[in-house]
From Swiss-Prot:
Subunit structure: Homotetramer.
Entry EC number(s): 1.2.1.19, 1.2.1.-
Residues annotated as catalytic: E246, C280
PROSITE patterns: ALDEHYDE_DEHYDR_GLU
Pfam families attached to this UniProt entry: Aldedh (PF00171)
Protein name: Gamma-aminobutyraldehyde dehydrogenase
NCBIfam families for this protein: ABALDH, PRK13473.1
Function (record text): Catalyzes the oxidation 4-aminobutanal (gamma-aminobutyraldehyde) to 4-aminobutanoate (gamma-aminobutyrate or GABA). This is the second step in one of two pathways for putrescine degradation, where putrescine is converted into 4-aminobutanoate via 4-aminobutanal. Also functions as a 5-aminopentanal dehydrogenase in a a L-lysine degradation pathway to succinate that proceeds via cadaverine, glutarate and L-2-hydroxyglutarate.
Organism name: Escherichia coli O9:H4 (strain HS)
Binding site for NAD(+): A146, P147, W148, K172, P173, S174, E175, D209, S225, I226, A227, T228, C280
InterPro entries listed in its UniProt record: Ald_DH/histidinol_DH (IPR016161), Ald_DH_C (IPR016163), Ald_DH_CS_GLU (IPR029510), Ald_DH_N (IPR016162), Aldehyde_DH_dom (IPR015590), Aminobutyraldehyde_DH (IPR015657), PatD (IPR017749)
Length: 474
């Protein structure tokens, strides 16, 4: 397995402390990788800064060609990437290959096209004898911090728009799941000029902090927890860096009495438990109107009970393990606290799976109340709660009564209600009669403590640029 870092166009071994990388399906150590040293972090940033002088002035066509080549080699090596992702994350292999790899390739291809559509503005004469122009220019060096739930996908979301806009990037994947990013480094080094892409390995304290705090870094992009976002914002405040934050969610799923219950059940069974629930948009916080509450709980419980946990390389496996032992304990603790309330009922699941690996049974909890921790706090596991509501006004207020603001969905046959409720929800995305669906052309990003800035779409590309005014006297 490729375990070297990419610094200034060269694959080099880390010079810091070795860290174990685990297979969460077995709990075994896959390998140990040496972290980047402080000197290597500095070298990566300085390489990116040096490369920016030329890369930032390349034409959109040149940048697009590089991104398209990278998309092609990812596609050609799709099986290799899927196997690495499956072993390192515990994802079902068929899901990694069939769902994630095509989406990752599409992100690079989309931004290759978008790079050629990012225009400034010829503003004209607002002062006699002077012509103004508006430019959108790259920022410089971007430090990108990717999470452990979708390692390669999030690397794509961060690399593609930044590079398309003309920036140079130093990427740090999670130390828990670094293998696909390091494999990407091996393939990218022969496509992009030296220093344009640098990929490091290490923990937040030893690598993330010196990277994000480096004086030559102009922007920090994070997908991670609220706590990590808060730390980075505080850590970078003195250098006034631009920050781009996607910090998780607790998606409300509002099910009205007139909803298609079978569609809701099928949707939540899929969208609430995909990737073992380790998704910031997971359909995890259901509000069911009183007329269909009992029916929904019964049917959904039966459906969730059929979800198959198992070995990632088994074609019939629907749920793999959680990413780490520490995360398994966090999920288990959240469910135990919910059970201890006395009013929350476990419909199915609610326990760790016996045997090796970090498996937690797909869980449905009914009877949750608005102020319960299971409703208010992100669990980030295969755990869905159901809360009864009376009317539209109540459920909109409850849905918005959350520190999160990333994703939401509304299930109803009433088109007017769908528009009315969607307009009032304080979430970056609202789906109607579906959930979880993402495309490269549409923006993804949150409000409130879920963060700010957009991934994907032309809005995502613009986030990696600076607006400049040029005035010419004539």
């Amino acid at each position: 397995m490729q375990h070297k870092l990419l610094i200034n166009g060269e694959l080099v071994s880390g010079e810091g402390e070795k860290q174990p990388v685990y297979n969460p399906a077995t709990g075994d150590v896959l390998l140990e990788i040496a972290e980047a040293s402080a000197e290597q972090v500095d070298a990566a940033v300085r390489a990116a800064d040096a490369a920016f002088a030329e890369w930032g002035q390349t034409t959109p066509k040149v940048r697009a060609e590089c991104l398209l080549k990278l998309a092609d080699v990812i596609e050609e090596n799709g099986q290799v990437f899927a196997e690495l992702e499956s072993r390192n994350c515990g994802k079902p292999l068929h899901s990694a290959f069939n769902d994630e790899i095509p989406a990752i390739v599409d992100v690079f291809r989309f931004f290759a096209g978008a790079a050629r559509c990012l225009n400034g503005l010829a503003a004209g004469e607002y002062l006699e004898g002077h012509t103004s122009m508006i430019r959108r220019d790259p920022l410089g060096v971007v430090a990108s911090i990717a999470p452990w739930n979708y390692p390669l996908m999030m690397a794509a979301w961060k690399l593609a728009p930044a590079l398309a806009a003309g920036n140079c990037v130093v990427l740090k994947p999670s130390e828990i799941t670094p293998l696909t990013a390091l494999k990407l480094a091996e393939l990218a080094k022969d496509i992009f000029p030296a220093g344009v892409i640098n990929i490091l390995f290490g923990r937040g304290k030893t690598v993330g902090d010196p990277l994000t705090g480096h004086p030559k870094v102009r922007m920090v992009s994070l997908t991670g927890s609220i706590a990590t976002g808060e730390h980075i914002i505080s850590h970078t405040a003195s250098s006034i860096k631009r920050t781009h934050m996607e910090l998780g969610g607790k998606a409300p799923v509002i099910v009205f009495d007139d909803a298609d219950i079978e569609a809701v059940v099928e949707g939540v069974r899929t969208f609430g438990y995909y990737n073992a629930g380790q998704d910031c948009t997971a359909a995890c916080r259901i509000y069911a109107q009183k007329g269909i509450y009992d029916t929904l709980v019964e049917k959904l419980g039966a459906a969730v009970a059929t979800l198959k946990s198992g070995a990632p390389d088994d074609e019939s496996t629907e749920l793999g393990p959680l990413s780490s032992l520490a995360h398994l304990e966090r999920v288990s603790k959240a469910v135990e606290e919910a059970k201890a309330t006395g009013h929350i009922k476990v419909i199915t699941g609610g326990e760790k799976r016996k045997g090796n690996g970090y498996y937690y049974a797909p869980t449905l909890l009914a009877g949750a109340l608005q102020d319960d921790a299971i409703v208010q706090k992100e669990v980030f596991g295969p755990v869905v709660s159901v809360t009864l509501f009376d009317n539209e006004e109540q459920v909109v207020n409850w849905a918005n009564d959350s520190q999160y603001g990333l994703a939401s969905s509304v299930w109803t046959k009433d088109v007017g209600r769908a528009h009315r409720v969607s307009a009032r929800l304080q979430y970056g995305c609202t789906w109607v009669n579906t959930h979880f669906m993402l495309v490269s052309e549409m923006p993804h990003g949150g409000q409130k403590l879920s963060g700010y800035g957009k991934d994907m779409s032309l809005y995502g590309l613009e986030d990696y640029t600076v607006v400049r005014h040029v005035m010419v006297k004539h």
